[in-house]
């Protein structure tokens, strides 16, 4: 039998899981379908998240979040959604081993960082993708920024706030930044290195220590930032007719609503800073927005005229399944009521 939900979140990063946490705790039957991986899962350490110590890895952070969401009654599927079809009363989501129907869909599909081409050897330590997350790590250290466009040049200049030793590496490609940006670069103490990288040196712990360039020179770096843009995961959004912005992100309102009724988007696939705390905030707003659009009460004057007054038999609005979870949860007022028989139980 195909399971039906009020809200189904596609993606299991900080934004999607926070949205699911809110919709579940606000009384809506919720599912998360997550393929796994993602930018947050790749983190060796967690930075800039109040209450989470830095030695917590991305996988540990996300696993804790998944367990929290499940503890409140949400269902979690490890699967890849390949298709979303509109139905008469919502949406049908098809994944490899999973098919569900849902009144609302939250797209939390994120993006992938564009990698250098040709690719560099992976170090795991020294190639970084988030300036606001990791710039602090390189205070007073030699740093590179890699790329040929305006954003790469501007990031190189931004890094001068943290260190005096910044190189901008074009890897043999012609710069594509504007004349205005070129003039700015000339007025900042940044060395532009045009030679291609042919090798990498690492220390015993696997941290990058230097790049070897095509002309034989060796330059020491503690780390840096490849800046080649983002590839937004919007295939599902496009199939639903969801509007996108010029930069490829999904256009949303303050609560994550898209131009398609019942479809929301949140996190890195939408405009804004690609940070865990901001993603969590967006997820919270999106979850609340879903609640605004789904909650049964208060009935409007038009609904009362059509359906009649709200009776005791109509309330509470929370589903019986989530009611059972709520009264048995350790967070329930007065403690978990495991001995309580929920509405609908024999």
Language-model features, listed with the residues they occupy:
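FAD-binding core/adjacent interface of flavoenzyme oxidoreductases
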Residues: 2-5, 76-141, 223, 250-254
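Beta1-alpha1 glycine-rich phosphate/pyrophosphate-binding loop at the start
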Residues: 3-60, 147, 153-175
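Redox-cofactor binding/interface segments in oxidoreductases and associated redox assembly factors
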Residues: 10, 107-108, 145, 213, ...
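A conserved FAD-binding loop/helix module that cradles the flavin
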Residues: 20, 155, 266-320
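N-terminal glycine-rich dinucleotide-binding loop that anchors FAD/FMN and/or NAD(P) in oxidoreductases
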Residues: 29-31, 35-37, 44-71, 130, ...
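A Rossmann-like FAD-binding core segment of flavoenzymes
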Residues: 69-87, 93-94, 100-102, 163-250, ...
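A short, charged, Gly/Pro-tolerant segment at domain boundaries
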Residues: 82-87, 294-346
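FAD-site-proximal beta/loop scaffold in flavoenzymes
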Residues: 121-137, 228-277, 288, 292
